[in-house]
Amino acid sequence: MYKTAETVSPGHPDKIADLISDYVLTEALSNNSKSRVAVETFLTGTTYGGLVVVGGEISDIAKIDDKGIEKIVKDALAKTIKTSFEDFQLDSLKIQNELTPQSEEIRSAVEDDEDLGAGDQGIMVGYATNETQSFMPPTFDISRNIQMALWEIQNNDEKLDLDSKVQVTTGGEETKVVISTQHKKDIDIDELRTVSYTHLTLPTKLSV
């Protein structure tokens, strides 16, 4: 049986979207600890510098307006996107705030003087294992460790951008790794392979 796990860097669009949503939640709770937030973020690169749409439902008491959303989005992007990333430019980026008040049906169903409902929110559970020092499953542990090392390289190499993905497959005769990262147009594929082999997979004795 083959097992595959993948992790994405903080510069991957999925992670950036999660970060923006997390910032919205943090801001809402700081404004009022009883705020209810169900927020989703969509972003895409464009020829005019990028588009970010923040939507979902949020309590009125959270008090986050268009200017607040704009600041949240730009703060998050400033931490996760390099200036060389052509599809996103903070000075020309379009930001849409599509947050709406929480529906009365949901509010009345989850708010009670004695019982506090969770709405449609859930908690994902996993398991711990003594196979690794992190107590995470080996496939995920390897993928995450390589991604963390790659993130350090990306932040110090001007030829690399911050969007990347690492996929690790175990269960066969050998562990296999696929590393994908955005980069400048002029970088050579052999140079990328050398970086991957020397700094990422060689120390862990994995095949590329």
What are these regions (language model features)?
Residues 1-35:
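N-terminal, positively charged regions that mediate nucleic acid binding
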Residues 3-4, 115-133:
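Residues forming anionic-ligand binding surfaces in small-molecule and nucleic-acid pockets
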Residues 198-204:
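Conserved small/polar residues in nucleotide/adenosyl-binding loops
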Residues 37-40, 48-109:
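Glycine-rich, N-terminal phosphate-binding loop and its surrounding beta-alpha-beta segment
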Residues 138-157, 196:
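Internal alpha/beta scaffold segment
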Residues 32-40, 83-93, 152-169, 200:
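Flexible, glycine/charged-enriched surface loops at secondary-structure junctions
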Residues 161-164, 172-197:
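Loop-centered beta-sheet repeat module
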Residues 61-69, 135, 186-193:
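Short, conserved charged micro-motifs
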